[in-house]
Each structure stands twice: as structure tokens, then as C-alpha cells.
Amino acid sequence: MRKVGIMGGTFNPIHFVHLLLAEAAYEQYHLEEIIFLPSKRPAYKPLSELIEEEHRFHMIELAISDNPHFSVSDMEFHREGNTYTADTLLELTKKFPDTEFYFIIGGDSLFELEKWSRPEIVMEKAHIVAAGRDDKDDDQMLQKIMELNEKYKAKIELLRVPMMEVSSRMLRERVKEGQSIRYFLPEAVRSYIIKHGFYL
């Protein structure tokens, strides 16, 4: 049975915390690879802030080019309408029945998981790996993990990783305000954003 990590999100833009989470999950769960899956149209985010999917895809390619166990897939771009994790996991588990999928989420998403579309399918079809931002979050997160595991017979675990306080929203705001985003994300991604005038 292969073990593959899935890193979903808009990646608008991708930054070092995304990469740090993926690498930590790869190591801690002995995964064969991590697949980055950018969303086409997430149901919960305003489309006005979202740059075109081909640019977000290319920025991921730039960011992961030096990591042999990272790859990126555009499978969610080919679906009409909003993008839902449940649909993606149903498609993946049907296509790859001999693979165990580990879906990597931030700690904030753990507390929103039951509000997702068909959360029971998400928790049935994949191990959920939830990243804690720091030790003080552990008790709350572990309590929530126990609650969801019991309620949904889920396989949720805590991913312990040193975290920086960086978000895609923060980077978009810094660009808009003319502030530097150097050292928050790979240099190739920063150059691509500047070249195309994104987030101004």
C-alpha cells in the first residue's frame, strides 16, 4: 500500500509554510510523495482575490522544482463549478485503490472541518494530518481530534511542526501596500509575482 500526501489549497500564492508543512508530513508519516492540488474555485474564498489557476500552478512548479518527492496536479482545474475536497478524494481513491492518502491541513481548518461539504467522506477517504502552530494549541487540537475521530471513526493525527506566522493573505496585502515579501516565499515565486504585477 502506497502512502501519498495531499496538500490542497488555493496557493494564492504558495509560500514557505506550505512547503514546511508538506516536508514535515513527508518525514513524520514516511510518505512516498506529496502532491500539491491547487483549487480552481474554492467555495469559501472570494474569487476577486484569486489569480488565474495557470499562474498559481506555475508558481507551485517553481517553488517545488528542487524537491524530488513533491509534485503538482491540475486535476481540480478540470471540474466545473466549485471545488470540494470530498469530490477530489472520491476521485483519487477510485483511481488509486492501492494508495492510502494523507490530507494535510492547517490547525485552523481542523475546527472548520465539519462545515466542509460532506465532511464524513473527507474523513473516511483519507487520513487527516492537522498541523499545530505551537504547543499552546495542542490541548485544544488534541481534544478536537479525539472528538472527530470518535464521531466519524476518522483517522486524524496531529502534525507537530515549527511554524512561522505567514499566510497568503498577508503576502497579498504586503504586495498591495508596496512592502517586501522577500524571504517569505521562494525567490522564483517572488520574481514571478513581480514580473506579472499580481496582487497590486
Curated annotation (Swiss-Prot):
Keywords: ATP-binding, NAD, Nucleotide-binding, Nucleotidyltransferase, Pyridine nucleotide biosynthesis, Transferase. Pfam families: CTP_transf_like. The keyword Disulfide bond does not apply. Pathway: Cofactor biosynthesis; NAD(+) biosynthesis; deamido-NAD(+) from nicotinate D-ribonucleotide: step 1/1. CDD domains: NMNAT. GO terms for biological process: NAD biosynthetic process. Gene3D superfamilies: HUPs. GO terms for molecular function: ATP binding; nicotinate-nucleotide adenylyltransferase activity. InterPro entries: Cyt_trans-like, NadD/NMNAT, Rossmann-like_a/b/a_fold. It is an enzyme of class 2 (transferase). Belongs to the NadD family. PANTHER family: NICOTINATE-NUCLEOTIDE ADENYLYLTRANSFERASE-RELATED (PTHR39321), PHOSPHOPANTETHEINE ADENYLYLTRANSFERASE (PTHR39321:SF3). This is Probable nicotinate-nucleotide adenylyltransferase.
